[in-house]
Design a protein with these regions (language model features):
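Membrane-interface helix-loop-helix modules in multi-pass inner-membrane proteins
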Residues: 3, 22-36, 48, 149-196
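Hydrophobic cores of alpha-helical transmembrane segments in multi-pass inner/ER membrane proteins
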Residues: 12-13, 35-50, 112-127, 184-196, ...
């Protein structure tokens, strides 16, 4: 059996296992999440399997550029479908919270945005580290492409959290451990982008940015565990692995769908941005000049 088939099978097994666990824990109430897990697991693992067999072919900017262009529409459409379905579940189907009323619905944006702010930073640090260790130009470009989207989601998490905090805490901001560490995350994103922009040599900029990204990764566990390590106003995790969610099934489904929509959006936008970075950095390469001639013609 080829490596591609093995990875594809593993992807389906993981997706099926996750869907089965949710089904037996919560029954048919989570059928939407089950379908999303199975479908996205199959699609994404199929793409991962494809790249595993063609890694060296697609590791160069020249080969990755057209491949990214073919992938963008798929992730963009997935993001659009998931966000429409997620918003419908979140604002039309999910019940009103008995304590917070309608104000709680901001969690359907706030919580997925907070998740994405951390996940994207880890992905950015990973690609930056790969670029630093293997001297891979494409990996460094991927890290650079992820940073702006990560900063946007971090800012979105902070703003929506402040709007949610006003009716809950009586103020828009407190120097809480969770809020402060999330604000530091925003500064890390901005610092990463500013540092790279301040260095003219792209290779030196990549190395400097990678060091900052890797050092800053220590902030991610601080954000996640801050509510456990310190006495904070911020509530605990909305979802705990191995523990059934306390929220209504439709609330959980809406939150997961919005998180998946944000993730698909991130991939689509990052691919668009990395194509622009490739063209900028490789503008003197022969294949880019040929591409320009073809587009003009």
């Amino acid at each position: 059996m080829s490596l591609k088939k093995i990875i594809f099978a593993l992807g389906l097994i993981i997706a099926l296992t996750a869907a089965t666990l949710i089904f037996f824990t919560h029954g048919l109430n989570y059928i939407g999440v089950n379908v999303a897990l199975l479908g996205l697991g199959a699609v994404l693992m199929r793409q991962s399997a494809y790249f595993s067999d063609n890694f060296y072919q697609h590791a160069s900017p020249q080969s990755f550029y057209p491949t990214a262009g073919r992938m963008i529409p798929w992730f963009a459409w997935l993001a659009a479908v998931l966000v429409i379905y997620g918003l419908y579940i979140s604002f039309a189907i999910a019940p009103t919270d008995f304590q917070q009323g309608e104000a709680y619905r901001i969690i359907f944006v706030h919580v997925p945005a907070a998740w994405m702010s951390m996940v994207i930073y880890l992905a950015m640090a990973f690609w930056a580290g790969v670029g630093l260790a293997l001297n891979s130009k494409l990996s460094a470009m991927m890290a650079q492409a992820l940073a702006p989207t990560g900063a946007i989601f971090t800012l979105l998490a902070l703003v929506t959290g402040s709007l949610w905090g006003k009716p809950m805490w009586g103020t828009y901001w407190v120097w809480d451990a969770r809020l402060t560490s999330e604000l530091i995350l925003l500064f890390l994103y901005l610092g990463f982008m500013a540092l790279q922009a301040s260095i003219d040599d792209p290779r030196k900029a990549d190395r400097a940015g990678a060091l900052l990204a890797l050092v800053g990764a220590v902030n991610i566990p601080i954000i996640y565990f801050s509510v456990k390590w310190w006495n904070t106003l911020h509530q605990g995790s909305s979802i705990n692995m191995g523990v059934a969610p306390k929220m209504a099934a439709t609330m959980f489904e809406g939150m997961i769908l919005m998180a998946l929509a944000f993730w698909m959006y991130t991939i689509a936008v990052a691919l668009i941005r990395v194509r622009c970075i490739i063209l900028e950095r490789e503008r003197n390469a022969g294949w880019v000049k040929e591409l320009s001639v073809k587009e003009i013609a």
